[in-house]
């Protein structure tokens, strides 16, 4: 049980998500969100979310130490920190922590702070930490959570004013034809209100997506208003002009993910239903030139199996990070034309085997993001360390264009769980339906609920 001094500190300082960014303008920026456990679970660990994707459990004493350091760092937001300033902040954080732990030597607290920060930076940058770090899966932590770690914001609808509202018409679009994907779009002020509500709900990461989010004239304003969050933009890249990229960089967008189906213009254009290859490629170049962290995403099918060539092409554009997937079984990807291009397990394994050889050669990073398409042992044998599992109502949720809350960004045909503008967050999160979907995800059985485990619920209107 926490001591009296620890309980007092928690009541005053640790009831909400805390956030700092180290080296914000550098290539090795480290975003740290410290997420408290439920108030009725005082012995549960705090959870650190590093750069929006790495999870680290933290005990209470180190959470208090880190919170005190965050308090000292906050006044320096956007400023360059000298070595003397850094040491002064660390000393002040140690002194404040000593008030909660008066029988612990300040030298020990200082050593702990240094070890913790060094280790967190190492983990965030994919390096080996000095400290021993425990392993914590979301399945183990699910009962302590009060919100997902990421909310995907579908800023733009697939249809608007009765007409198609996207500058592409992708063969495998997960949103096309789903009822909530065509919902009326919210205004700028309504999305700004939602960002405030998401922060109050302790959700540390948002993704701006669509449809095509760059069709929104207020995109930069919304990204700028979301600087407390880890932010990502999912786009087809056609509208990523040098001017827009510079503004997004100035608004502190953390990363941009561009969908590139192939290095072959004809294949890419056939799959996106538009003559967009050159604009997408130029958009990638513009984003890289602006200093944005860029990743390329490729849904894999029988028409773009030369994925190794796509990775080489992406690397030539300055891209280091890549993701690929099977076809999400929703929207247009449920149609006969898309289904006919789905890869067999053997074919997909061959594509990934060739891809892994290329990323190893070029020093790129590759993740496969579709749960249930390949067995875990196959993915590990290929050298893929991320084993995807369904995150619906657990690690991630999404908002439709009208603010409707849905289990994930592909879950656009069933009744919403609520609306972010009008419903109390706790009542949505703790509702029987949301809890049931979360319980399925928490099994961590590496199956997409729209594909297997909860298909009936996903199809229910």
PLM region descriptions:
Residues 159, 166, 170-173, 390-393, ...:
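Short cysteine clusters
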Residues 128-150, 370-378, 417-436:
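Short, charged low-complexity linear segments at domain edges
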Residues 3, 58-150:
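Long, charge-rich, low-complexity alpha-helical segments
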Residues 101, 111-247, 251, 255:
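Conserved alpha-helical substructure of the radical SAM core
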Residues 2-13, 30-37, 254, 261, ...:
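Radical SAM enzyme [4Fe-4S]-AdoMet core and its adjacent flexible, acidic
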Residues 5, 9, 14, 404-461:
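Flexible mid-to-C-terminal extensions adjoining Fe-S/redox cofactors in radical SAM and related proteins
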Residues 1-77, 142-144:
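Acidic, low-complexity/disordered tracts enriched in E/D and polar residues
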């Amino acid at each position: 049980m926490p001591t009296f001094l620890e309980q007092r500190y928690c009541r005053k300082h640790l009831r909400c998500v805390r956030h700092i960014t180290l080296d914000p303008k550098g290539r090795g920026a480290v975003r740290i969100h410290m997420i408290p456990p439920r108030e009725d679970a005082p012995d549960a660990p705090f959870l650190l979310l590093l750069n929006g994707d790495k999870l680290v459990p933290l005990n209470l004493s180190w959470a208090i130490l880190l919170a005190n350091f965050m308090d000292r760092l906050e006044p320096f937001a956007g400023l360059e920190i000298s070595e003397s300033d850094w040491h002064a902040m660390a000393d002040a954080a140690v002194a404040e922590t000593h008030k909660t732990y008066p029988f612990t030597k300040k030298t020990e607290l200082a050593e702990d702070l240094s070890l913790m920060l060094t280790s967190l930076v190492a983990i965030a940058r994919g390096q080996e930490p000095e400290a021993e770090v425990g392993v914590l899966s979301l399945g183990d932590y699910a009962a302590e959570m009060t919100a997902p770690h990421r909310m995907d914001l579908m800023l733009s609808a697939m249809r608007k004013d009765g007409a198609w509202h996207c500058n592409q018409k992708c063969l495998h679009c997960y949103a096309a034809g789903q009822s909530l994907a065509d919902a009326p779009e919210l205004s700028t002020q309504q999305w700004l209100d939602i960002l405030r509500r998401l922060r109050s709900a302790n959700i540390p990461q948002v993704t701006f997506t669509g449809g095509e989010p760059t069709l929104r004239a207020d995109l930069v304003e919304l990204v700028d208003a979301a600087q407390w969050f880890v932010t990502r933009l999912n786009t087809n890249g056609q509208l990523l002009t040098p001017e827009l990229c510079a503004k997004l960089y100035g608004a502190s967008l953390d990363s941009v993910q561009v969908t590139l189906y192939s290095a072959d213009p004809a294949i890419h254009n056939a799959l996106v239903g538009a003559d967009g290859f050159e604009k997408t490629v130029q958009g990638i170049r513009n984003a890289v030139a602006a200093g944005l962290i860029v990743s390329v995403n490729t849904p894999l099918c029988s028409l773009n199996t030369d994925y190794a060539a796509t990775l080489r092409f992406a690397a030539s554009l300055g891209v280091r990070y890549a993701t690929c997937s099977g076809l999400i079984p929703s929207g247009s990807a449920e149609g006969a034309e898309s289904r006919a291009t789905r890869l067999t397990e053997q074919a997909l394994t061959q594509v990934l085997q060739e891809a892994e050889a290329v990323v190893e050669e070029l020093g790129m990073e590759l993740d496969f993001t579709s749960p249930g398409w390949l067995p875990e042992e196959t993915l590990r044998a290929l050298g893929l360390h991320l084993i995807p599992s369904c995150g619906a109502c657990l690690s991630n949720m999404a908002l439709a264009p009208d603010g409707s809350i849905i289990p994930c960004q592909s879950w656009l045909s069933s009744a919403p769980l609520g609306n972010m503008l009008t419903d109390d967050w706790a009542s949505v999160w703790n509702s029987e339906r949301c809890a049931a979907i979360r319980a399925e995800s928490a099994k961590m059985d590496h199956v997409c609920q729209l594909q297997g485990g909860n298909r009936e619920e996903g199809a229910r209107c």
